[in-house]
């Protein structure tokens, strides 16, 4: 039960929830804490002033905000709690849990009213302190949020089991111990709060005050309040809306927004969701059991490592003492290596024990909380939180997936001392990675017919010789740096196929592979030469035959037919080839089509009448098609995207099934050169803030782009934009997006800069400088946005120009900041 306690505490005050309410994001807040973190919104910024009156804000329209940009021009505008500035006349303070609390903008309520019952200022806004989602309250104020009766029941049972002292429910800071309870108000008071909020005069003089212990008993014996509809407070929930995933009353079905929705019986859905949560808990329980057994195994490994270390050190000392004085100088070095290996193993195992212990404690707490929730007999209250709990249970179960319950370190010391060398070889005395006399694996064979390159990625495949009798524990793939430098390991594992991404375009790499087991490593395979893409399109390599030479070449041939160009970079990729070669096509340059005649040799093209924005001339020239097409194209990558991302249009169009921001990357990474791509806004509802930019391959996929240090982005709404990296917001710029808008991203790795464009106009200054490394195009969005990579070709941004000379098209100059 102790692990469950953190599930029962408010993220604002840090105490047990008191009168918890459920926010649209499924998180909970004390009603008093919710009032403390309200922020009043000016009339000009409210949604009612931007839309027709009476439209209202639904429970799930919390993305329809102006991102809290209300107090300062330097404000970032994103609803990240504690990250926006307050007005100079509005001091703010932090709660014990570190959440920034704003005082109410209205005068304090009368003393005879509790804070939970006081009127909410008009156009008040509340931000969830856990997920940082913001919502402007409607006329109902906090009464529009449903009460979490199930959570209240769980907290009551938990406190009774702990015999905890009852706390005052009206203390603004750390709650004091309650001294009385009012049976009519159903509120616990300390002495100062009782005198201030419940004076013994007027109507309150007739209220009966009892000791807290007696009040707890009477509260437990009294029937729990039935959850009522938030839209119709006098009606109880009677049905369950399948589309909105919430209980509703009969008036909602007759005249409310659920009248055309599919509904089901409340009791049936209650049983169904209880069954789903129970099934999810079964899987999580199995994971928790495995984790406990795994922790026992890890603790046993600590003892085994200690014993093996002592045994190994004794053997080492015995061998070194038998040698002459020259060996004694070497002995100290060898002992140091053993101790280092010993400490390394212990550190790895202890770190894994600590990690698994924390994860197991969190899992156990969630299980206990879910079991207590299942015991509740309130269908309506249960259904309000069941979906969120089921998702959390599945997510926690997935975190115990493959590899989590595998030891990261072995208990054996795979070292042995060879004491046979003569004294003249004493300076070469060292450990050998051998403890048995079994042979090393045979040299792997590269399967050339399965090796290929695609854009800036290379796929290699290998196998063991057919007649080999020695098993390999794994393989080590090595690649040089593309410039003839030293080899480095890019893969270590049991698989016999590996795809290496993020290579330089138009570069040559050398690859080799070797096998290993407990005895040692095999010799290297033959060296394979890889040539990455130097042309647009997707090309497959031809099968290759094995040769007797030590070096083999993996070709990247120009195909006889070229696929339509989907996505190209850099700026010189404004050529748009629709049909396959040979034949006729059209040249799309600044929306002006010009006929091209394509030579069958595919070496050049003629563009009569093309105006390349030189001073006044109109050119008819031969352009080197090899250089013109030395670009990359890409689509969105379903493999690395968040599971909520929805793909269409050959992975060129994406949207999301969640109200939360989710990240999707492009398939191709860039590490040098100048690259530009555009995205169009196909759908834009409720003024969300999608983000566009670049990211590392390991960027967080479940939050807005730029929230971590792995992404560089611009997020934009219908009025303005900001640049964001590592959750730092800069350069607020006026001008937003609507449906049909175009977002351009210019990644200049030669100058190490990142620039953004909106509707062909540069948005703000150069967004980021000193960017270097491997970057992937990236977008974050939610279900209110749909974007597409610009197809069928690219356009040059306003202010960009091209230089044209016979036989070549050069890369453009970047627009002036």
From Swiss-Prot:
- What top-tier enzyme class does this entry carry? transferase
**Domain COS, which positions?**
374-432
Q: Phosphothreonine (modified residue): where?
A: 41
Q: Which GO terms describe its molecular function?
A: ubiquitin protein ligase activity; zinc ion binding
Segments traversing the membrane: none
Q: Which Pfam families match?
A: ANCHR-like_BBOX (PF22586), fn3 (PF00041), SPRY (PF00622), zf-B_box (PF00643), zf-RING_UBOX (PF13445)
What positions does the domain Fibronectin type-III occupy? 440-535
**In which tissues has expression of this protein been reported?**
Brain. Expression is higher in the cerebral cortex and hippocampus (at protein level). Its expression is mainly confined to the central nervous system. The developing neocortex, the dorsal thalamus, the midbrain, the basal area of the hindbrain and spinal cord show high level of expression during embryogenesis. In adult brain, it is detected in the Purkinje cells of the cerebellum, in the hippocampus, and in the cortex.
For the region Disordered, give the residue spans. Answer: 535-557
Instruction: Provide the coiled-coil residue spans.
Output: 273-340
- Catalytic activity, per the record? S-ubiquitinyl-[E2 ubiquitin-conjugating enzyme]-L-cysteine + [acceptor protein]-L-lysine = [E2 ubiquitin-conjugating enzyme]-L-cysteine + N(6)-ubiquitinyl-[acceptor protein]-L-lysine
Mark the B box-type zinc finger spans by residue number: 163-212, 224-266
A GO CC annotation recorded here is:
dendrite
Q: Which GO biological process categories is it annotated with?
A: proteasome-mediated ubiquitin-dependent protein catabolic process; protein ubiquitination; synaptic vesicle exocytosis
EC number(s) from the headed UniProt entry: 2.3.2.27
Where Phosphoserine occurs along the chain? 44, 46, 49, 53
Query: Regarding domains, what does the record say?
Result: The coiled coil domain mediates the interaction with the N-terminal t-SNARE domain of SNAP25.
Free-text function comment from the UniProt entry:
E3 ubiquitin-protein ligase which ubiquitinates itself in cooperation with an E2 enzyme UBE2D2/UBC4 and serves as a targeting signal for proteasomal degradation. May play a role in regulation of neuronal functions. May act as a regulator of synaptic vesicle exocytosis by controlling the availability of SNAP25 for the SNARE complex formation.
This chain belongs to which protein, by name? E3 ubiquitin-protein ligase TRIM9
Source organism per entry reads: Mus musculus (Mouse)
Name the encoding gene, please.
Trim9
């Amino acid at each position: 039960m102790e692990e469950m306690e953190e599930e029962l505490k408010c993220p604002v005050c840090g105490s047990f929830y008191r009168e918890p309410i459920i926010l649209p994001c499924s998180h909970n807040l004390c009603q008093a804490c919710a009032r403390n973190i309200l922020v009043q919104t000016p009339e000009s910024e409210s949604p009612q002033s931007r839309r027709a009156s009476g439209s209202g804000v639904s429970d799930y329209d919390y993305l329809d905000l102006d991102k809290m940009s209300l107090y300062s021009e330097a404000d970032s505008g994103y609803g990240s709690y504690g990250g926006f500035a307050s007005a100079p006349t509005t001091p703010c303070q932090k709660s014990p849990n570190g959440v920034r609390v704003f005082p109410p903008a209205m005068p304090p309520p009368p003393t005879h009213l509790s804070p939970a019952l006081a009127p909410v200022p008009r156009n008040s806004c509340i931000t969830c302190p856990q997920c940082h989602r913001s919502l402007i309250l409607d006329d109902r104020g906090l009464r529009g949020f449903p009460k979490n009766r199930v959570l209240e029941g769980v907290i009551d049972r938990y406190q009774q089991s702990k015999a905890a002292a009852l706390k005052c429910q009206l203390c603004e800071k750390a709650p004091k111990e309650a001294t009385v309870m009012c049976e009519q108000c159903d509120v616990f008071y300390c002495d100062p709060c009782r005198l201030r909020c419940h004076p013994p005069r007027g109507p309150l003089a007739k209220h009966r005050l009892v000791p807290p212990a007696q009040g707890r008993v009477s509260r437990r014996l009294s029937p729990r309040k039935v959850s009522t509809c938030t839209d119709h407070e006098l009606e109880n929930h009677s049905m369950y809306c399948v589309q909105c995933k919430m209980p509703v009353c009969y008036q909602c079905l007759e005249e409310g927004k659920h009248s055309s929705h599919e509904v089901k019986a409340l009791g049936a859905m209650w049983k169904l969701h209880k069954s789903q949560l129970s099934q999810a808990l079964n899987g999580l329980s199995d994971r928790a059991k495995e984790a406990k057994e795994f922790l026992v195994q890890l603790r046993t490994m600590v003892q085994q490592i200690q014993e093996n270390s002592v045994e190994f050190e004794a053997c080492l000392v015995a061998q070194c003492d038998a040698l002459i004085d020259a060996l004694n100088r070497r002995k100290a070095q060898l002992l140091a290596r053993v101790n280092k290996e010993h400490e390394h193993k212990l550190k790895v195992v202890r770190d894994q024990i600590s990690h698994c212990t924390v994860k197991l404690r969190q899992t156990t707490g969630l299980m206990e909380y879910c079991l207590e929730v299942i015991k509740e007999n309130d269908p309506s209250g249960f259904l309000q939180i069941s979906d969120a709990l089921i998702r959390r249970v599945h997510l926690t179960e997935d975190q115990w997936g493959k590899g989590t319950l595998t030891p990261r370190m072995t208990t054996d010391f795979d070292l042995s001392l060879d004491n046979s060398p003569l004294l003249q070889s004493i300076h070469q005395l060292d450990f050998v990675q051998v403890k048995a006399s079994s042979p090393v694996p045979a040299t792997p064979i590269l399967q050339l017919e399965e090796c290929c390159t695609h854009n800036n990625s290379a796929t290699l495949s290998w196998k063991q010789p057919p007649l080999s009798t020695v098993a390999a524990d794994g393989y080590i793939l090595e690649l040089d740096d593309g410039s003839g430098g030293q080899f480095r390991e890019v893969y270590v594992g049991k698989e016999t196929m590996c795809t290496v991404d993020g290579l330089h375009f138009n570069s040559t790499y050398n690859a080799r592979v070797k096998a290993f087991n407990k005895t040692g490593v095999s010799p290297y395979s033959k060296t394979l030469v890889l040539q990455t893409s130097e042309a647009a399109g997707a090309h497959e390599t031809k099968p290759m035959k094995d040769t007797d030479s030590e070096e083999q070449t993996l070709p990247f041939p120009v195909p006889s037919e070229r696929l339509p160009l989907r996505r190209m970079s850099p700026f010189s990729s404004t050529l748009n080839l629709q049909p396959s070669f040979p034949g006729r096509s059209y040249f799309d340059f600044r929306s002006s089509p010009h006929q091209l005649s394509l030579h069958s040799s595919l070496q050049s093209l003629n563009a009569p009448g093309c105006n390349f924005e030189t001073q006044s001339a109109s050119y008819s020239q031969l352009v080197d098609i090899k250089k013109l097409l030395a670009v990359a194209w890409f689509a969105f990558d379903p493999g690395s995207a968040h599971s909520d991302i929805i793909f269409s249009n050959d992975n060129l169009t994406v949207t999301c099934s969640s109200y939360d921001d989710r990240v999707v990357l492009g398939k191709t990474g860039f590490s040098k050169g100048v690259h530009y791509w555009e995205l169009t806004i196909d759908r834009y509802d409720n003024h969300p803030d999608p983000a566009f930019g670049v990211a590392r391959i390991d960027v967080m996929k479940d939050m807005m782009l730029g929230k971590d240090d792995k992404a560089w982005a611009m997020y934009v709404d219908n009025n303005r934009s900001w640049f964001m990296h590592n959750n730092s917001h800069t350069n607020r710029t006026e001008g937003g997006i609507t449906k049909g808008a175009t977002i351009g991203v210019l990644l200049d790795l030669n100058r190490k800069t990142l620039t953004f464009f909106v509707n062909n106009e540069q948005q703000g200054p150069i967004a980021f400088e000193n960017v270097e490394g491997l970057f992937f195009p990236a977008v974050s969005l939610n279900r209110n946005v749909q974007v597409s990579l610009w197809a069928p070709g690219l356009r040059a941004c306003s202010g960009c120009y091209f230089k044209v000379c016979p036989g070549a098209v050069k890369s453009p100059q970047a627009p002036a900041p």
